[in-house]
From Swiss-Prot:
This is Lon protease. Homohexamer. Organized in a ring with a central cavity. It catalyses: Hydrolysis of proteins in presence of ATP. Its main location: cytoplasm. Coiled coil: none annotated. Residues 691-870 form the Lon proteolytic domain. ATP-dependent serine protease that mediates the selective degradation of mutant and abnormal proteins as well as certain short-lived regulatory proteins. Required for cellular homeostasis and for survival from DNA damage and developmental changes induced by stress. Degrades polypeptides processively to yield small peptide fragments that are 5 to 10 amino acids long. Binds to DNA in a double-stranded, site-specific manner. ATP binds at G454, P455, P456, G457, T458, G459, K460, T461. Belongs to the peptidase S16 family. It is found in: Cytoplasm. It comes from Mesomycoplasma hyopneumoniae (strain 232). The gene is lon.
Length: 870
């Protein structure tokens, strides 16, 4: 065996590469003990002292957890003083002193096949002493501790087998010369390196370094070169450095290169400390700020407690927010806003104005229903029964509403993927509300808005209430009449003093659910001024594609109105803004007939009034004839509000007579009794003549109060050939009269009229001059009255007519035929001329009216002339 070959130890990063101070390794596994014994007996005098061995280092490879324990010797990751403390920990002890050649089954020893597995440089070590702990019978070693020093850095040359034991390998080495002298290195540089290492608090300095520094200071024989080597090599073995960093420093053969690289490593640690210090300063600043805020908040709490106030309000809100119901009801964005405002309120002085504003805002956020809904009653039979019970007549209207609700019920029951309402306690939660991805569902689930158009008192509001009751919805009414400020709908911004949310949000807060029926009353009576146009704000509310994201200025959060059933009412369809009209579905309600009013009075009004006044029905014996008298002579309306007031007045007067005991025991409410209680009749039938008159013809009119008759009078006076119009006629009606006169003049010969138009003034008057009148539908009535006056032929008082006339005598369609017909019916008209184009509207006329009145559809005026004057 060559003299420069050595047994070797495969080391890990815990071996000090060039540390000249004494180190220790503990062995306790049987195989390592066996190898040590062979090493012990390798000379004539058995010993381990002063024997040399190599410490070799494996090359860095990818980690293989399966071979980790068999390929790398494990040492404690700390300095040499800790080896003795860890000798009882098998995993932290050295496994083998000799490397073995070959591959042996069940071997825990490192397997070294050639030098390519090892790093180029190794450490030559000498055993200084050893301590062996033997078995009780002194025959076997159990634990061996080797004390050694690294004597030299060497280069590996060849791996060879031991002839005596082929299983054991040895390595041939050669010395390595390391240069140290350089003008770049002097004692001050080493001292600076030591100072930087001390300041880098995260860089661990081996304790051996103190011995080297002390030795150099106390022993003048300890040369500068030895000092430089000792400091450099000891710092290079710092536990703070990684194994690759340690070996890289070990591999340099020039101490200037080692010191330069070591300086870079320590400088990196110093920069890390600097960065950590900066971060700590920032953290301390933030912590100081938080502590200051905490102290101030605690002081505020103490002050509030001293003033008799506490934080129960904020605690109650937080408790609600974290409750099971709160987690389900409040959307995430709303919950964040509530928490933010609650924290803001905690830091405020209670008496400050801002505190009151924030508290009012929090009250609204907590009071709104958000995802809370009321479960609908999806029963079409129940809807029909409720409407029949609540209203008499209005069959067509009931059909429209039932069809509408049936479609709604069917759509909801057949909707795919919609989960059932979640019940939390006694409340229902709709998880489909306030979803971010619901835009794509809008068109398939959009519901048109119902708008009931009709005269006052015809039951628009009561129908809406009946619908809400029928499908189990909460009902709330919003009166829009006279609203001129857009903020009434969208709310005021919180920056304004006395700011409030809009009527929509207030209504939802009032009912406490997000799926009520909201009645928008008098939608046709909204106005606009310099404060904005509220009808424009209503566009967002009534548009199913927008109301899912309705924003109130006060709330400043989106509110989902998609589950609200809106029902609007109006008296006149022409007064509804066109953009709004485009978003709603119109259902028209017309005047009640006399028979309907009588039945309504008997079935609804009289029982309701008697109940309100706690009067026994036996004290209100009334017949249909008397009710009809009340309707005709004490009311003039399309609905029944006035009739209810008249009945209520009669009931009160009967109660007075009961208390005064002046009421006959067998009295009956007849026409004379009514006159006694109410006085003379307030209304007579419209001024319809009782006999045919020359120059007077009955026309038909329509107003928000319903239909009525109007007399058109024509007389001739000597004068210039001209026309005079009186009776508060507006432009369209004046033009209609002039067109009728021009038509009659052009057809005078055909009508047998021989009249001096150039020297005669024709005066046309429509009575009740205080009432403005407009519209083209009196055209044929003007023509008939003019012909009657010029030809001196009377027209029957039982005939009425409505229709626009052209210069060629064509009769054009008109609107409001049903209401006009009801006005004629109330005044005893028997024959009505209507435009042929309106014949299709006769289906809307009640049968009881058609049984009394004859309708004659005409295309041209000639047909009317032939019927009346020939």
């Amino acid at each position: 065996m060559p003299t420069n070959s050595y047994r070797f130890l495969v080391a890990s990063e815990d071996i000090y590469f060039q540390n000249t101070l004494q180190q220790s390794i503990t062995f306790s596994d049987p195989e390592s003990i066996k190898v040590l014994k062979d090493f012990y007996h390798s000379n004539s005098r058995p010993t381990l002292t002063n024997k040399d061995f190599l410490i070799v280092y494996r090359k860095e490879k990818e980690k293989d957890t399966k071979k980790k324990n068999s390929s790398v010797i494990k040492f404690p990751r700390n300095d040499f003083n800790s080896f003795e403390d860890s000798k009882n920990d098998i995993q932290n002890q050295a496994k083998i002193l000799n490397g073995k050649v070959g591959d042996f089954e069940n071997s825990l020893l490192p397997r070294i096949y050639d030098l390519d597995e090892l790093s180029k440089y190794a450490s030559l070590a000498r055993i200084q002493s050893y301590r062996a702990k033997t078995s009780p019978d002194k025959s076997e070693w159990q634990t061996v501790i080797l004390d050694f020093i690294v004597t030299e850095k060497v280069q590996l040359v060849e791996l060879i087998n031991d002839p005596q034991n082929p299983k054991v390998g040895q390595i041939i080495i050669k010395p390595v010369r390391e240069t140290i002298k350089s003008p770049e290195i002097h004692i001050n540089l080493i001292n600076d390196l030591l100072e930087m290492a001390r300041k880098a608090k995260n860089f661990r300095i081996p304790t051996e370094l103190l011995l080297i520094v002390d030795k150099f200071g106390a022993n003048s024989e300890y040369s500068t070169n030895e000092y430089i080597k000792g400091v450099t090599n000891t710092l290079s073995c710092s536990p703070s450095l990684t194994y690759p960093q340690k070996y890289q420093l070990f591999s340099y053969n020039s101490y200037p290169a080692k010191i330069k690289k070591l300086y870079e490593h320590i400088h990196t640690f110093a920069e890390q400390i600097k960065l950590e210090d900066e971060i700590n300063v920032i953290l301390k600043t933030n912590l100081d700020k938080q502590q200051t805020e905490f102290i101030l908040k605690e002081k505020i709490k103490a002050i509030r407690k001293k003033l008799g106030e506490d934080s129960r309000y904020e605690d109650e809100i937080e408790e609600l927010l974290h409750s099971e119901l709160g987690k389900k009801v409040f959307p995430k964005e709303v919950a964040k806003t509530i928490m933010r405002e609650t924290n803001k309120l905690k830091s405020m002085i209670v008496t400050s104005p801002e505190s009151n504003i924030t508290k009012s805002y929090l009250d609204l956020l907590v009071a709104l229903p958000w995802k809370k809904v009321k479960k609908d009653i999806l029963d079409i039979k129940n809807v029909r029964e409720k409407l029949e019970e609540a209203h008499y007549g209005l069959d067509e209207i009931k059909k429209r509403i039932i069809e509408y609700l049936a479609a709604l019920i069917h759509r909801r029951s057949q909707s795919e993927g919609k989960p059932e309402l979640e019940k939390v306690g006694s409340d229902y939660i709709d998880s489909n509300l306030f979803l971010s991805h619901k835009i794509r569902k809008v068109r398939s689930n959009s519901i048109p808005i119902l708008t009931l158009v009709g005269p006052p008192g015809t039951g628009k509001t009561s129908i809406a209430m009946a619908v809400a009751e029928a499908i189990g919805k909460e009902f709330v009414k919003i009166s829009l009449g006279g609203i001129r400020d857009e903020a009434e709908i969208r709310g005021h911004r919180r920056t304004y003093v006395g700011a409030l949310p809009g009527k929509i949000i207030q209504a939802l807060k009032k009912v406490g659910v997000s799926n009520p029926l909201i009645l928008l009353d008098e939608i046709d009576k909204m106005g606009a001024d310099f404060k904005g146009d509220p009808s424009a704000a209503m566009l967002e509310v009534l548009d199913p594609e927008q109301n899912r994201f309705f924003q109130d200025h006060y709330l400043e959060l989106e509110y989902d109105l998609s589950q609200v059933l809106f029902v609007a009412t109006a008296n006149e369809i022409y007064d509804i803004p066109e953009p709004l009209l485009d978003r709603v579905e119109i259902i028209e309600l017309s005047s009640y007939t006399f028979i309907e009013k009588i039945q309504i009075a008997k079935s609804h009004l009289i029982p309701a009034v008697l109940k309100e006044n706690a009067l026994d029905p036996k004290y209100f014996p009334i017949q249909d004839q008397t009710i009809d008298f009340l309707i005709r002579h004490y009311t003039r309306e399309a609905g029944v509000r006035g009739l209810k007031r008249v009945i209520d007045k009669i009931v009160r007067k009967i109660i007075v007579k009961l208390l005064e005991k002046t009421l006959d025991q067998n009295f009956v409410i007849d026409i004379e009794f009514v006159r006694e209680l109410l006085g003379i009749e307030k209304y007579d039938p419209d001024n319809v003549d009782s006999s045919p008159q020359i120059g007077t013809v009955t026309g038909l009119g329509y107003s928000p109060l319903g239909g009525s008759t109007l007399q058109i009078e024509v007389s001739t006076i000597p004068g210039r050939g001209d026309i005079k119009l009186t009776g508060s006629l507006k432009d369209v009606m004046q033009e209609s009269a002039r067109i009728a006169l021009s038509y009659v003049q052009s057809k005078a010969k055909d009508f047998g009229i021989n009249f001096d138009f150039e020297n005669t003034l024709i005066h046309i008057h429509v009575p009740e001059g205080a009432i403005p009148k407009d519209g083209p539908s009196a055209g044929i009535t003007f023509a008939t009255a003019i012909i009657s006056a010029l030809s001196q032929k009377p027209v029957s008082h039982n005939i009425a007519m409505t229709g626009e006339i052209t210069l060629r005598g064509k009769v054009l369609a008109i609107g409001g035929l049903k209401e006009k017909t009801m006005g004629a019916y109330k005044n005893g008209i028997k024959i009505i001329f209507i435009p042929k184009a309106n014949e299709k509207n006769l289906v809307d006329i009640p049968q009881e009216v058609k049984d009394v009145i004859q309708f004659i559809p005409v295309d041209t005026y000639q047909q009317i002339y032939d019927f009346i004057f020939k």
